[in-house]
Amino acid sequence: MTFRSCLVAAACSAFLAIAIPQISQADELTAGQKSEVERILRDYLIAHPEVIQDAMAELDKRQSAADAEKHKATIKQNAQTIFSSPRQVVLGNPDGNVTFVEFFDYNCGYCKRAMDDMLTLLKDDPKLKIVLKEFPVLGPGSVEAAQVAVAVRMQDKTGKKYLEFHQKLLGGRGQADKARALAVAKDIGLDMTRLEKDLASAEVKATLQENFKVAEALGLNGTPSYVIGDNVVVGAVGLEALKEKVNTTRCGKPTC
């Protein structure tokens, strides 16, 4: 039996497990009538498994809609932290009419690929505000790299040095950790004495705690993840999909 067949069979079984007891509880049916209805229902579903598939598709659609509404409520409740926290890096137009928030991990392969998408949006869209949030979910090395990134942000109010650091570390090969992150920071000419001091400050821990708290509220557990307007986008969906979300947020349709 193929995986598809197994899936349909399991769905049929689950449907019948729910439906048959309900039929059995119908007092107006005789025992013989109940048995006949059960047989007809079972035979129909086995003969037409696409009904189960359609039902599953509709269930997925409703679940997606429910998730979207939940995300909208969560984003509204946490809007200040998501879009305007003083503990975040802002690139592009700080007064942009759409804010594009990315949660990333320096050891995330998909984030490495998605970086070009963010950079293209940054270059091509003068009305876009881009917010970067460190979200180190891939182990100790990721946490160390994120901590250094926060310290970089603390001595760079313009975001220019942070972006340079971000591109070099995320775009580099191999595992990102404290040693590599510090090497990149030194290479781009940052004040290393201040960086080490900032790295030991409470601000670094507070920043990452804030990022994790809002990510948890949004139900995020992987990277890259995005908040665009009142929408959550999970995964490296590609430049065109991100553009469509930005345009929909800006003017209500995929193409402005």
Residue ranges and their predicted role:
Residues 101, 112-186, 216-221, 252, ...:
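Structural alpha/beta surface segment adjacent to cysteine/selenocysteine redox centers
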Residues 104-107, 222:
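Short pre-active-site segment immediately N-terminal to redox-active cysteine/selenocysteine motifs
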Residues 108-112, 225-227:
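The canonical Cys-X-X-Cys-His
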Residues 80-98:
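A short beta-strand-turn-helix
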Residues 105-106, 135-136, 231, 238:
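Solvent-exposed coil/turn segments that connect beta secondary-structure elements
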Residues 2-5, 10, 18-79:
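N-terminal targeting signals for export/organelle localization
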